[in-house]
Design a protein with these regions (language model features):
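C-terminal substrate-recognition "lid" of short-chain dehydrogenase/reductases
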Residues: 14, 92, 145, 223-252, ...
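Conserved glycine-rich cofactor-binding loop
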Residues: 19, 26-28, 50
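The beta1-alpha1 cofactor-binding region of Rossmann-like NAD(H)/NADP(H)-dependent oxidoreductases
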Residues: 51, 72-83, 115, 228-229
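Substrate-binding pocket helix/loop in short-chain dehydrogenase/reductase
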Residues: 81, 109-110, 114-122, 215
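Active-site helix of classical SDR
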Residues: 133, 169, 177
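Alpha-helical segment proximal to the catalytic Tyr-Lys
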Residues: 138, 182-186, 243
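Residue(s) in the substrate-gating loop at a strand-loop-helix junction
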Residues: 153
C-alpha cells in the first residue's frame, strides 16, 4: 500500500470532530456501526431502550479518544426523541451523522398476526426513522451538511414468510429514504439506506446446522455476512467522500438479492 493511497484512505475514513447518533447501538449491527465510527474519530451518542446497556457501550467506546454518551431512547416516542437530540446539541453543538438502526421483529403468519404486533413493529422500525430524521435535519439544514443512513433489510425487497409487518416496515424505510433524499439534497444532506441480508448474530448462532446450510445455499458467496460487513458500508456512506451518493440502497447480502 503506497503512501498516497494511505493518505487518501485516512482522509475519507477520518471524521475527527464530527458528531453522530446511532439508534439501537448496543448490540449486533448497531454496536458494530458505533464502534467503527468511534474508531474514525466521531463523537457519538449511543441510544438504546435500556439506559444501562447504552452507558456500558458508551464507556467501552470512549477508549478510542472520542466522547461517547449513552442515552435511553424509545425511538417511537416523540418526546424522548426530542430530548435525546436536544441533549446532543447541548453537549456537542452539532449533529453530522444519524444512523437509524433501531428495529424489532414480532413474527407471525398474516392470518394469526395480532394488530398490536403489527403496530409495535411499525412504530419502532418506521415511525422511529421518521421521528429521528425529522429532528436531525433541523441541525443538518443549518449546517448545510449531514449524513443520514437508514438500516433496512433484504426482506424489504424479497419478502419473508411470517414477517409481513417487518418486511413492510423495512420497505417503508426505502420509500422514506428516497423522498427525504430529494427534499434535502439542496441543503447538502445525503440520505441513504443499507440493506443487510443474512448476518451472523446471536439469533443465527442458535440455528441448527442444517438450517444454516440451507440458508447459505441462497447466497452466491456461500456464507453469512458479519456485522462488520454492514458497518463498513455505513461508515462509507457517512464519509465526506460519499457526498455524491444519495437516495440509494446499498445491499450487503453476498449476492442473495441482486
Amino acid at each position: 500500500m503506497n503512501a498516497s493511497f494511505k493518505a487518501y484512505r485516512r482522509r475519507i475514513m477520518d471524521f475527527r470532530g464530527q458528531v453522530g447518533i446511532v439508534t439501537g447501538g448496543t448490540r449486533g449491527i448497531g454496536n458494530a456501526i458505533a464502534a467503527k465510527l468511534a474508531q474514525r474519530g466521531v463523537n457519538l451518542v449511543v441510544a438504546a431502550r435500556t439506559r444501562e446497556a447504552a452507558h456500558e457501550v458508551a464507556a467501552s467506546l470512549s477508549n478510542h479518544g472520542v466522547k461517547v454518551l449513552g442515552m435511553k431512547l424509545d425511538v417511537s416516542n416523540a418526546e424522548e426523541v426530542e430530548k435525546v437530540f436536544e441533549e446532543t446539541r447541548k453537549e456537542f453543538g452539532r449533529i453530522d451523522i444519524l444512523v437509524n438502526n433501531a428495529g424489532i421483529t414480532k413474527d407471525g403468519l398474516l392470518m394469526r398476526m395480532r394488530e398490536d404486533a403489527w403496530d409495535a413493529v411499525m412504530d419502532i422500525n418506521l415511525k422511529g426513522v421518521f421521528l429521528c430524521s425529522r429532528e436531525a435535519v433541523k441541525d443538518m439544514t443549518k449546517q448545510r451538511y449531514g449524513r443520514i443512513i437508514n438500516i433496512t433489510s433484504v426482506a424489504a425487497f424479497m419478502g419473508n414468510p411470517g414477517q409481513a409487518n417487518y418486511s413492510a416496515s423495512k420497505a417503508g424505510i426505502v420509500g422514506f429514504t428516497k423522498t427525504v433524499a430529494r427534499e434535502y439534497a439542496v441543503r447538502g444532506i445525503t440520505v441513504n439506506a443499507v440493506a443487510p441480508g443474512f448476518i451472523e448474530t446471536a439469533m443465527t448462532d442458535v440455528l441448527p446446522a442444517n438450517i444454516k446450510d440451507d440458508m447459505k445455499k441462497m447466497i452466491p458467496l456461500g456464507r453469512f455476512g458479519t456485522v462488520d460487513d454492514v458497518a463498513q458500508a455505513v461508515v462509507f456512506l457517512a464519509s465526506p467522500d460519499a457526498g455524491y451518493i444519495t437516495g440509494q440502497v446499498i445491499h450487503v447480502n453476498g449476492g442473495m438479492y441482486m
